[in-house]
């Protein structure tokens, strides 16, 4: 009989993942975020590491390449971005920070050291709060502590060619400004980790300091975790959120198995760094082989000293933060669902090229205010958001027409007039959709005949006004004709019995089509129910 021994480093569980009460997860994150400044951190090279991928070493200054005699010149745009993020994370700003040298040798780090902020970082002692209704965590609120934020250089990029046994070095990324953010080990489940990463991504995008993309490397996450206060394990090589979550699951199960089998004192007492392969974690190094980085203050860079008015001015420039915007939109007078509010506020960065998040958000707020000023407390809260998110944006996508090109002719004030017409039932939803698409198509084709959009005139021109004076006899005859020509006894019986109540909307749709959208869906539904003698 073949006996296979267990190998803890290759442990995999086929059962659904769960955190066990006797094995407490303790987890923290280190997140490196590339800043989208115009220039690099300590040189005047263009900061464009992604668009220059096909042109290696094209954005490299003498300092980036560490040529002898070159000296760093601090890009203060990176400092401003770091202060913005620090304030958004409720950190204490260090008014007298410094840069330090972290010494190590690697091919893509030509200086022989990285300039960072080890001893006196730009900020510390902050927090980012997660909420049940916003972030879909299991607790009503969970505060994740921020130990510190520090400004530092990114490295170059190494590309290995195993077949030719050499390495190519691209220094376009060298000296790109980074913010390293280190959290406290406050995460106790995977939902919190996933939600925090998503929230942090949206925050840096909202502040316009980074794209926050994990896939491109603009944001890179390392995980520190331990179980039951055993030694900390650092996980690296985590290119996206699913990798982060799967690596934590695997490492948790691996360590639980070690503890259960009584090998914790042998295998979990020394801190170590492990890499995620996509399937499992593998050991890179242990504490005994940890590099001595020989930190020391950089003698070529002065301390960064901030006056109080600098911090105040930067604070005043920060836009309203996402959580505050969401809370505002789900409250009176907007009363949006959290789902709709998130569409307006949260920036996925997989953004449709037809609009920016800020454009969409501002457009909605102005449309709503104009609509509310006209109809007052009689407003339909869903009307503006539905017509903007679904109909307007849907049509823009279909026509490949940017919102910015539409705004000069279809301003929020003008669009609110359109919403008021729908509110007052001066045009049916079906006709309104056709009219909106027509107007947008004319704008796309640069039809100069549309100098100013007049929805009332267009409704008159295309005879889109609802047939409010249609007699009950005409309406009954139309509905009876539709039922007769449909000749579908099973469908009618399902409607009458209540087995398929929603099927009556199919009849309403036929009525709307036959009347070219001039009859109201409500009157059609009432008439169909009366003819069919529906009791429900």
From Swiss-Prot:
- Example GO biological process term? glutaminyl-tRNAGln biosynthesis via transamidation
Mind telling me which SMART domains this protein's record contains? GatB_Yqey
Q: Look up the EC number in the record and give it.
A: 6.3.5.-
Q: Write out the catalysed reaction.
A: L-glutamyl-tRNA(Gln) + L-glutamine + ATP + H2O = L-glutaminyl-tRNA(Gln) + L-glutamate + ADP + phosphate + H(+)
This protein's GO cellular component annotations are: glutamyl-tRNA(Gln) amidotransferase complex; mitochondrion
Pfam families, per database record: GatB_N, GatB_Yqey
Q: What is this protein's function?
A: Allows the formation of correctly charged Gln-tRNA(Gln) through the transamidation of misacylated Glu-tRNA(Gln) in the mitochondria. The reaction takes place in the presence of glutamine and ATP through an activated gamma-phospho-Glu-tRNA(Gln).
- Other facts noted in the record for this chain: This protein may be expected to contain an N-terminal transit peptide but none has been predicted.
Subunit (UniProt): Subunit of the heterotrimeric GatFAB amidotransferase (AdT) complex, composed of A, B and F subunits.
Please give the family membership noted in the entry: Belongs to the GatB/GatE family. GatB subfamily.
Q: Which HAMAP family match?
A: GatB
Give the protein name, as stated in the record.
Answer: Glutamyl-tRNA(Gln) amidotransferase subunit B, mitochondrial
Source organism of this protein record: Vanderwaltozyma polyspora (strain ATCC 22028 / DSM 70294 / BCRC 21397 / CBS 2163 / NBRC 10782 / NRRL Y-8283 / UCD 57-17) (Kluyveromyces polysporus)
What lineage, starting at the top, does this entry show? Eukaryota, Fungi, Dikarya, Ascomycota, Saccharomycotina
């Amino acid at each position: 009989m073949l006996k296979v021994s267990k190998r803890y480093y290759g442990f995999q569980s086929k059962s659904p993942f769960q955190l066990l009460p006797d094995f407490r997860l303790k987890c923290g994150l280190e997140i490196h975020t590339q800043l989208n400044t115009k220039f690099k951190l300590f040189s005047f090279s263009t900061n464009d590491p992604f668009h220059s991928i096909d042109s290696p070493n094209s954005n490299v200054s003498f300092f980036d390449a560490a040529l002898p005699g070159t000296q760093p010149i601090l890009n203060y745009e990176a400092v401003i971005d770091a202060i913005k993020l620090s304030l958004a994370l409720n950190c204490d700003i260090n008014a007298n920070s410094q840069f330090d040298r972290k010494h190590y040798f690697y091919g893509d780090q030509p200086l022989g050291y990285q300039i960072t902020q080890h001893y006196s970082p730009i900020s510390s002692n902050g927090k980012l709060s997660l909420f049940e209704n916003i972030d879909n965590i299991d607790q009503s609120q969970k505060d994740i502590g921020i130990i510190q934020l520090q400004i530092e250089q990114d490295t170059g990029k190494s590309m290995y060619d195993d077949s030719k046994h050499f390495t190519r070095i691209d220094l376009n990324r060298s000296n790109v400004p980074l913010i390293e953010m280190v959290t406290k080990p406050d995460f106790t489940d995977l939902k919190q980790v996933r939600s925090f990463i998503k929230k942090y991504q949206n925050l840096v995008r909202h502040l316009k300091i980074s794209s926050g993309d994990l896939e491109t490397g603009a944001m890179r996450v390392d995980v520190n975790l331990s179980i039951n206060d055993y030694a900390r394990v650092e996980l690296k090589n985590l290119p996206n959120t699913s990798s982060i979550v799967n690596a934590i699951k695997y490492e948790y199960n691996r360590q639980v198995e070690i503890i259960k089998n009584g090998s914790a004192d042998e295998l979990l007492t020394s801190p170590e760094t492990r890499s995620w392969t996509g399937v499992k974690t593998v050991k890179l190094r242990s504490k005994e082989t940890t590099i001595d980085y020989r930190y020391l203050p950089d003698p070529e860079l002065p301390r960064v000293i901030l006056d109080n008015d600098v911090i105040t001015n930067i604070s005043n420039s920060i836009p309203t933060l996402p959580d505050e915007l969401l809370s505002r939109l789900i409250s009176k007078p907007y009363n949006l669902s959290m789902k709709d509010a998130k569409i307006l506020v949260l920036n996925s960065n997989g953004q449709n090229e037809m609009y920016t998040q800020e454009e969409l958000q501002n457009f909605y707020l102005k449309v709503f205010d104009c609509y509310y000023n006209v109809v007052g407390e009689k407003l339909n809260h869903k009307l503006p958001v539905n017509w903007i998110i679904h109909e307007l944006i849907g049509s823009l996508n279909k026509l490949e027409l940017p919102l910015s090109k539409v705004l000069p002719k279809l301003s929020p004030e003008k669009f609110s007039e359109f919403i008021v017409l729908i509110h007052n039932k001066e045009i049916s939803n079906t006709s309104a959709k056709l009219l909106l698409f027509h107007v947008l198509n004319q704008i796309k084709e640069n039809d100069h005949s549309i100098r100013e959009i007049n929805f009332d005139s267009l409704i008159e021109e295309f005879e889109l006004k609802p047939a409010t004076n249609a007699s009950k006899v005409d309406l009954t005859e139309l509905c009876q004709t539709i039922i007769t020509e449909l000749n579908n006894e099973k469908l009618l019986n399902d409607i009458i019995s209540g087995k398929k109540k929603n099927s009556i909307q199919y009849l309403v749709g036929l009525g709307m089509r036959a009347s070219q959208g001039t009859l109201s869906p409500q009157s059609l539904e009432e008439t169909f129910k009366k003819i069919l003698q529906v009791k429900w």
